[in-house]
Amino acid sequence: MQTQRLRIAIQKKGRLSQECQELLKKCGVKFNIMGERLVVHSLNMPIDLLLVRDDDIPGLIMDGVVDLGFVGENVLEETRLDRLALNQRNEFTTLRRMDFGGCRLSIAIEKDAEYRGPQDLNGKRIATTYPQLLKAYMDRQGVDFSTCMLTGSVEVAPRAGLADAIADLVSTGATLEANGLKEVEVIFESKATLIQRPGAFAADKAALIDKLLTRMHGVQQAKESKYIMLHAPVEKLAQIKTLLPGAEDPTVLPLSADKSKVAVHMVSSENLFWETMEQLKALGASSILVLPIEKMME
């Protein structure tokens, strides 16, 4: 089923949903999400947002129901493996890995348990919401185990006597710590990713996708970059430039009153830390300003 409007699936609720919405707004897509609506129409572009459960998004893409989808790589790979096992459609194209939504799927055991490696999990029962990712990892390790399938509160399984270990998503590790568990193996590293359905697109829809990708790249580049302005002694300019990794060569302008210094303007492709600013100061730089960049196009 195809329409003239670009259909983008995003998670209905949660932090990933908020970050995807913020990214689209920074890309110039205007919309108002109100109430429990499933479909939200953009106010200024031929784009519809579908607000759905995160684990529904890969299937909607693979079945060609929607054009694009933002989803965590952990959910995407779990769905792909599940559909592969069931001989169902599992094709998609990854367009861009995002710089948000980071987490990892890890195996954790009770804090006081001895652990020497994956072979210690032989014959154990492991609780998880990601059975396919867990099985793929254990098969690579040659470990025989059984799965306890849970859809929530996986971390309480060992304490409740349901399992010997768990395989669950970890961000900071605070939840594991609170439940007397320790992380012992990382199964899968994940971030949010933008995926596209299989098949060709009409020219206008393909052009709109390219426009969005260009803007997303600009938003991410702006987030990772800073605009730097400073006054630098002419004789120290070469040394100062080595401290400032830039997207391009800096703009160097003469000062009206002080001929021994120049004004340097540049976009730095890396974060400028206090230590770097102190090094610049030590080389005679002054009036150092570091500014955020809202949008950027190379």
Curated annotation (Swiss-Prot):
It is an enzyme of class 2 (transferase). Keywords: Amino-acid biosynthesis, ATP-binding, Cytoplasm, Glycosyltransferase, Histidine biosynthesis, Magnesium, Metal-binding, Nucleotide-binding, Transferase. Pathway: Amino-acid biosynthesis; L-histidine biosynthesis; L-histidine from 5-phospho-alpha-D-ribose 1-diphosphate: step 1/9. SUPFAM superfamilies: GlnB-like, Periplasmic binding protein-like II. It catalyses: 1-(5-phospho-beta-D-ribosyl)-ATP + diphosphate = 5-phospho-alpha-D-ribose 1-diphosphate + ATP. GO terms for molecular function: ATP binding; ATP phosphoribosyltransferase activity; magnesium ion binding. The keyword Zinc-finger does not apply. Its cofactor is Mg(2+). It is found in: Cytoplasm. One of its GO terms (biological process) is L-histidine biosynthetic process. Transmembrane segments: none annotated. InterPro entries: ATP-PRT_HisG_long (IPR020621), ATP_PRibTrfase_cat (IPR013820), ATP_PRibTrfase_CS (IPR018198), ATP_PRibTrfase_HisG (IPR001348), HisG_C (IPR013115), N-reg_PII-like_a/b (IPR011322), N-reg_PII/ATP_PRibTrfase_C (IPR015867). Its EC number is 2.4.2.17. PROSITE patterns: ATP_P_PHORIBOSYLTR. GO terms for cellular component: cytoplasm. Feedback inhibited by histidine. The keyword Isomerase does not apply. Catalyzes the condensation of ATP and 5-phosphoribose 1-diphosphate to form N'-(5'-phosphoribosyl)-ATP (PR-ATP). Has a crucial role in the pathway because the rate of histidine biosynthesis seems to be controlled primarily by regulation of HisG enzymatic activity. Belongs to the ATP phosphoribosyltransferase family. Long subfamily. NCBIfam families: hisG, HisG_C-term. This is ATP phosphoribosyltransferase. It comes from Vibrio cholerae serotype O1 (strain ATCC 39315 / El Tor Inaba N16961).
